[in-house]
Amino acid sequence: MPSLFTIGGYKVYFWSNENNEPIHVHIAKGKPTPNSTKIWITSKGGCIVANNASHIPINELNEILEIVAAQFFLICAEWRKHFMVSDIQFYC
């Protein structure tokens, strides 16, 4: 599972076996875990919280969402590279 970047101790990463799903990232404090927060990336560069399974406090989660949205192009490029796809499927 490639780590994209770290925000205040939270890792933002992909799970390597989820390329059949629309583009999204996982967020966890410290090392990646199956019980991580999942964020859908929208086609317009926004974010939708699919779940907050890692219980990130809302004020921290909102800051993370802003940074993830600002990294839209990086995340899309890394998704294409990691999953070896040319077209990205978005949640919405």
How would you label these PLM feature ranges?
Residues 53-92:
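Acidic, low-complexity intrinsically disordered segments
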Residues 1-23:
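Short, charged/polar N-terminal "headpieces" of proteins
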Residues 17-59:
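A short, structured beta-strand/loop element
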Residues 2, 13-15, 27-29, 63, ...:
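Short, flexible coil/linker segments at or flanking structured domains
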